[in-house]
């Protein structure tokens, strides 16, 4: 079904739809697997490609993004590709300056400090037209993949994007962003609405360009407790999925599965399972069997091996994967890590993880 439906531009036919079938809740012969940050600095070829230009110049080069997206697939039999890009291209498209400082991470020289700073932001309706380079990268990559596996598009969720725009970069406390929530709730909602209005056409545009699934990253969910999350994050997470689905229908595009990954958002698992996403991503702090009890059979779960488990021996990785697969069960499940791969990880161990998922999930189905 899916392979034919999501070929808006006569792309090559999909040969491996295991990831999409699992996302839709259909039965699969084995458990599909991909890794967050699978296109990353742990690969020497990634570091080599990236050395040619600065980070955001790389993001703006469809050819470079395509090459980086395909690199892990040349090494490992992954069941999905995720486009190489960054969640901060959206604040950039809204007119904010963002630089990537080597060894430090993203930096906003002029973060949002006052309510009136919101006036500096561009009209969110123009954002998708500013991000044509992402759409070009997706189309090129989808063609180059030649139907090998599906291509995932992504974006950051409104609260997570807001934290960067207010904090001016990464933060261990998010105290400036949370100060906004407590001191300027109206302005906070205004900013979150602007971001939602920017994200919807951006995500619809990714599907129009060839993305076959979408993941929304609420990476900073854990900085909010249940109350703040249900007030300032969840309504926008819901709104994104509802409006993207409506936007796809309006554009005459087939529906694609959507994944919500709210890191450290275990306190809102039930709500996330009912937020309009086909897949809920889990970090490693959540016990799989407990998560399954809490969300029921209505959604697919994705995750959630501790990325640091890949520092273990290949034999130990196999045992940990086996345990994880037993805990999640064979169906309505996509294997992944509970967060992205770290730069100092051994590619051989990433391969061991992928192979172990395929091997043990097949054995699990035989028994």
Curated annotation (Swiss-Prot):
InterPro entries: UROD/MetE-like_sf, Uroporphyrinogen_deCO2ase_HemE, Uroporphyrinogen_deCOase. Pfam families: URO-D (PF01208). GO terms for cellular component: cytosol. Keywords: Acetylation, Cytoplasm, Decarboxylase, Disease variant, Heme biosynthesis, Lyase, Porphyrin biosynthesis. Coproporphyrinogen I binds at residues 37, 39, 41, 50, 86, 164, 219, 339. One of its GO terms (biological process) is protoporphyrinogen IX biosynthetic process. It is found in: Cytoplasm, Cytosol. Coproporphyrinogen III binds at residues 37, 39, 41, 86, 164, 219, 339. Coiled coil: none annotated. The record marks 86 as: Transition state stabilizer. Pathway: Porphyrin-containing compound metabolism; protoporphyrin-IX biosynthesis; coproporphyrinogen-III from 5-aminolevulinate: step 4/4. The modification N-acetylmethionine is found at residue 1. It catalyses: uroporphyrinogen III + 4 H(+) = coproporphyrinogen III + 4 CO2; uroporphyrinogen I + 4 H(+) = coproporphyrinogen I + 4 CO2. GO terms for molecular function: uroporphyrinogen decarboxylase activity. Its EC number is 4.1.1.37. It is linked to Defects in UROD are the cause of porphyria cutanea tarda (PCT). PCT has been identified in a flock of German Blackface sheep. It is characterized by photosensitivity and porphyrinuria. Belongs to the uroporphyrinogen decarboxylase family. Catalyzes the sequential decarboxylation of the four acetate side chains of uroporphyrinogen to form coproporphyrinogen and participates in the fifth step in the heme biosynthetic pathway. Isomer I or isomer III of uroporphyrinogen may serve as substrate, but only coproporphyrinogen III can ultimately be converted to heme. In vitro also decarboxylates pentacarboxylate porphyrinogen I. This is Uroporphyrinogen decarboxylase. It comes from Ovis aries. The gene is UROD.
């Amino acid at each position: 079904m899916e392979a034919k439906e999501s070929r808006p531009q006569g792309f090559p036919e999909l040969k491996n739809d295991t990831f999409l079938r699992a996302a839709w809740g259909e039965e699969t012969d084995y458990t599909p697997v991909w890794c967050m940050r699978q296109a990353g600095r742990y690969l020497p070829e990634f570091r080599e490609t990236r050395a040619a230009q600065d980070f955001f110049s790389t993001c703006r080069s469809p050819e470079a993004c395509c090459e980086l997206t395909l690199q892990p697939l040349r090494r490992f039999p992954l069941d999905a590709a995720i486009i190489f890009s960054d969640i901060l291209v959206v604040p950039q498209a809204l007119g904010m300056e963002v630089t990537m400082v080597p060894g430090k991470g993203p930096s906003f020289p002029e973060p949002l400090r006052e309510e009136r700073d919101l006036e500096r932001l561009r009209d969110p309706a123009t954002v998708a037209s500013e991000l044509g380079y992402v759409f070009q990268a997706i189309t090129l990559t989808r063609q180059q993949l030649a139907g090998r596996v599906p291509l995932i598009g992504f974006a950051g969720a409104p609260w997570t994007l807001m934290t960067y725009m207010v904090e001016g970069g990464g933060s261990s406390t998010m105290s400036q962003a949370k100060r906004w929530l407590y001191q300027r709730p109206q302005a906070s909602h205004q900013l979150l609405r602007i971001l939602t209005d920017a994200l919807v056409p951006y995500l619809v545009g990714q599907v129009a360009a060839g993305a076959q699934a979408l993941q929304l990253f609420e990476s900073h969910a854990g900085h909010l407790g249940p109350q703040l999350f249900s007030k300032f994050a969840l309504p926008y997470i819901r709104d994104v999925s509802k409006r993207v689905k409506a936007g796809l229908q309006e554009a005459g595009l087939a529906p694609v599965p959507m994944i919500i990954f709210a890191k450290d958002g275990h306190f809102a698992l039930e709500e996330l399972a009912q937020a309009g996403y086909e897949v809920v991503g889990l970090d490693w702090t959540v016990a799989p069997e407990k998560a399954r009890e809490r969300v029921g059979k209505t959604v697919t779960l994705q995750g959630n091996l501790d990325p640091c488990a890949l520092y273990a021996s290949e034999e130990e990785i196999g045992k940990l994967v086996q345990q994880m697969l037993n805990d999640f069960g064979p169906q309505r499940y996509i294997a992944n890590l509970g967060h992205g791969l770290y730069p100092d990880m051994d590619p051989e161990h990433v391969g061991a993880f992928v192979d172990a998922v395929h091997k043990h999930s097949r054995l699990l189905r035989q028994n």
